[in-house]
């Protein structure tokens, strides 16, 4: 997980310059494993979104943040867009209690999730031939 405090200004989905350095490190790791597919998930706290910028609510903000990260990984760092997905979880998958300031901060995050290779998974489920 990467804290959204590092990646974005409050209520924004524009990635900060400092965050681009962190994403560069992530990109280096992912480039060295070209077979890996991954999803970038945006998460928010439960405070209702009150900004503008074409953002409707926290769910929308989380999707736009994930998409911003994916676009930077593609355009700035050359990662294969066919290996990436962007998703927003909004406030609906918190790590911590939203009743505290610390909990809200923990819940505002972006997560990079390595996706399983489903063909390999299904091969594991197939019965092995015995000789």
Question: What spans do the regions from the language model cover?
Answer:
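Periplasmic OmpA-like peptidoglycan-binding domain that tethers envelope proteins to the cell wall
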Residues: 12-25, 33, 43-131
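Extended, gly/pro-poor, charged amphipathic helical "stalk/hinge" elements that serve as dimerization
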Residues: 1, 5-7
């Amino acid at each position: 997980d990467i804290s959204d405090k590092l990646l974005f200004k409050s209520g924004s989905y524009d990635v900060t310059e400092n965050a681009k350095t962190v994403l560069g490190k992530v990109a280096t790791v992912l480039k060295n494993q070209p077979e890996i597919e991954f999803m970038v998930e945006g998460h928010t706290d439960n405070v209702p979104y009150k900004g503008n910028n074409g953002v409707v609510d926290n769910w929308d903000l989380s999707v736009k943040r994930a998409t911003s990260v994916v676009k930077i990984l593609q355009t700035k760092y050359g990662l294969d867009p066919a290996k990436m997905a962007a998703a927003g979880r909004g406030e609906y998958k918190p790590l911590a209690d939203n009743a505290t300031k610390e909990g809200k901060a923990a819940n505002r995050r972006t997560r990079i999730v390595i996706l399983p290779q489903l063909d390999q998974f299904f091969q594991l489920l197939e019965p092995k031939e015995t000789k």
